[in-house]
Design a protein with these regions (language model features):
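Extracellular (secreted or membrane-anchored) zinc-dependent metallopeptidases
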Residues: 1-192
Length: 194
């Protein structure tokens, strides 16, 4: 890209606004890594969104091993979380107080968790039993505290690749062929814009 910072408005997804156009979203998962303003770590489209914006956006210092990384968000879990959105998952709290993510084996929870809670972490929606599933990739805890998808979440994501599923074309994609065979040229040097 030729911009140093982007707002959460999809500008990074278009050459004309200083970003890079999406590749064929029936063959590739588009991932834009850039400097996002306002503390946003990332965001994603959902299956069925317009092809020219299809993919995920990740804050440049929320993954990797070198540079000025975000201390609590430097293990790549933002990418895991956003790709799961791209695969149809909602936040575990259903984006509303005691909401529903429509997954049979995730508990209801009041809202998102942050930091690294201790188990069990009970809330008004889960006052008994195991409490909130704060270690789920679809919560907002620190990267070091996230470690699982439930079986129900895995089934939902995998269903997108089934026959007639919105991501089914990936099963026959030639995108994993060598880059030169696919016709796409790689830059000789990749330097982040800071």
């Amino acid at each position: 890209t030729n911009r140093s910072i982007f707002s959460v408005d999809d500008a990074m997804k278009f050459n004309l606004s200083g970003g890079d156009n999406a590749w064929d979203c029936t063959q590739y998962l588009n991932i834009w890594v850039c400097n996002l303003e306002g503390g946003t770590l990332g965001y994603a489209t959902q299956p069925g969104d317009p092809a020219d914006v299809d993919g995920v956006v990740i804050q440049y210092n929320a993954l990797g091993r070198i540079g000025n990384l975000q201390s609590n968000f430097n293990k790549g879990r933002t990418a895991t979380h956003e790709i799961a959105h791209w695969l149809g998952l909602k936040h575990i709290w259903g984006d509303t107080d005691c909401g529903d993510d429509h997954i049979f084996d995730t508990p209801q929870q009041y809202g998102y968790n942050n930091g690294c809670p201790s188990f069990p972490h009970l809330s008004t929606c889960s006052p008994n039993g195991n409490g909130d599933m704060f270690m789920n990739f679809m919560d907002y805890t620190n990267d070091a505290c996230m470690n699982l998808f439930t079986n129900g979440q895995k089934l939902k994501m995998r269903a997108l690749f089934a026959l007639n599923g919105p991501r089914n074309s990936f099963l026959n994609s030639t995108a994993c062929d060598s880059v030169t065979e696919s016709g796409a040229a790689l830059p000789t040097e990749v330097t982040p814009v800071v």
